[in-house]
């Protein structure tokens, strides 16, 4: 099964400090170089962490890379291949692939559009919210039926983090 989830990973150049050599996630060889890269919770030779499309060495072109469908991609190739992340469920406008988003019940929102249907306050990562019949409610404005147990929310969420960039 191919994983279609997108992950943005920070690429960090670290010194090997003379410790035991690490194995490269790309070629499997020991990393004896003075500097190595740490990305996606693995160690890499600087020459081995490359974009699957353009073959650019990712440590040389920035500090982040994206993984999707088994590919490791630079930002430009990710945007070229996967374009936008769809339309915002609140405003209907397109969401660029590089923009952070919030999700609820399969719906995608711009960060600025992820607001309570009653008070219109923006909900941020860590806020509790309720998703009822396609509407988002903050903890304070949740429908009264939820308090008495008469209404079943489609989703009543614990604190939520924003999705990784894109998707």
UniProtKB/Swiss-Prot annotation:
Functional description taken from the UniProt entry: Acts as a positive cofactor of GATA transcription factors to establish the identity of the ventral mesoderm during gastrulation. Down-regulation in the dorsal mesoderm is necessary for the proper formation of this territory since, when present, lmo4 may bind ldb1 and restrict the availability of this cofactor for Spemman organizer transcription factors. At neurula stages, suppresses primary neuron differentiation and modulates gene expression at the Isthmic Organizer of the midbrain-hindbrain boundary.
GO MF annotations, alphabetized: metal ion binding; transcription coregulator activity
Keywords: Developmental protein, Differentiation, Gastrulation, LIM domain, Metal-binding, Neurogenesis, Repeat, Transcription, Transcription regulation, Zinc
UniProt xrefs under PROSITE patterns: LIM_DOMAIN_1 (PS00478), LIM_DOMAIN_2 (PS50023)
UniProt entry tagged with the keyword Zinc: yes
Protein name in the entry: LIM domain transcription factor LMO4.1
Superkingdom assignment: Eukaryota
Gene: lmo4.1
LIM zinc-binding domain boundaries: 22-84, 86-148
CDD domains (alphabetical): LIM1_LMO4, LIM2_LMO4
Region (Disordered): 1-20
SMART domains for the chain: LIM (SM00132)
Gene Ontology biological process terms, A to Z: cell differentiation; gastrulation; mesoderm development; negative regulation of neuron differentiation; nervous system development; positive regulation of transcription by RNA polymerase II
Polar residues bias spans: 1-17
């Amino acid at each position: 099964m191919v994983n279609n989830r997108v992950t943005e990973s920070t690429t960090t150049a670290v010194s090997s400090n003379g410790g035991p050599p690490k194995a490269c996630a790309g070629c499997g060889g020991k990393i004896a170089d003075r500097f190595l890269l740490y990305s996606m919770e693995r160690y890499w030779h600087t020459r081995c962490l490359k974009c699957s499309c353009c073959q650019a060495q990712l440590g040389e072109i920035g500090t982040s890379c994206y993984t999707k469908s088994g590919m490791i991609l630079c930002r430009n190739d990710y945007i070229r291949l996967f374009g936008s992340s769809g339309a915002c469920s609140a405003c209907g406008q397109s969401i660029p692939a590089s923009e952070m988003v919030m999700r609820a019940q399969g719906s995608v929102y711009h960060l600025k559009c992820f607001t309570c249907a009653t008070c219109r306050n923006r909900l941020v990562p860590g806020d509790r919210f309720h998703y009822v019949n396609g509407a988002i409610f903050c903890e304070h404005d949740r429908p009264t039926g939820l308090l008495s147990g008469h209404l079943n929310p489609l989703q009543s969420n614990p604190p939520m983090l924003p999705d990784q960039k894109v998707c």
